[in-house]
Amino acid sequence: GTASDGLRTTDNFDMFSGAPDRYNWELKGRKEMLVPYNAYALHAKGVAYDDIIKPGHLNADYLRYEKHRVYVVEATLKEGISNIYSKRVFYIDEDSWNIVAIDMYDSRGDYWRLAESHGINYYDVPVYYNTVDAVYDLQSGRYTAIGFKNNEDMIKFGQDFSASDFTPDRLRRAGRR
């Protein structure tokens, strides 16, 4: 993805936003495992980003993991398709249907990266949605984290848009806030 120094791909947005037809998909089953969940401390207003972002990993004092049932879905890159990940294993929360973690493998089949989606319940919407997504490169020891919302304006879920909201002039004005 842009602005991630190569640590994240565009199709990693919201954990996975790629073309599903590029992979062979297989439901491996369902299991219980510890996954990021109810990350209210990470989402708390006023917590400085410098307190959360630490060398090598997010500050564990702000993270929460819970035992949840997840569906394990394996996506193997189809022959002739190009992507830096030859395989991804998705862990999809049984309750929210959110992808809460992904194991990603390089072209040699080696375990390369781990993605975690730290979410919370937005009870007034209602929806369970990420507050921070992190991608850890296990080979380089680097990581990137995006989507911090605790010191930003609240997401406007369900906002109505029209085609005129996406004209070059309107987008230019929106970018100057």
Question: Each PLM stretch: what is its role?
Answer:
Residues 1-20, 58, 66-159:
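Gly/Pro-enriched, hydrophobic low-complexity segments
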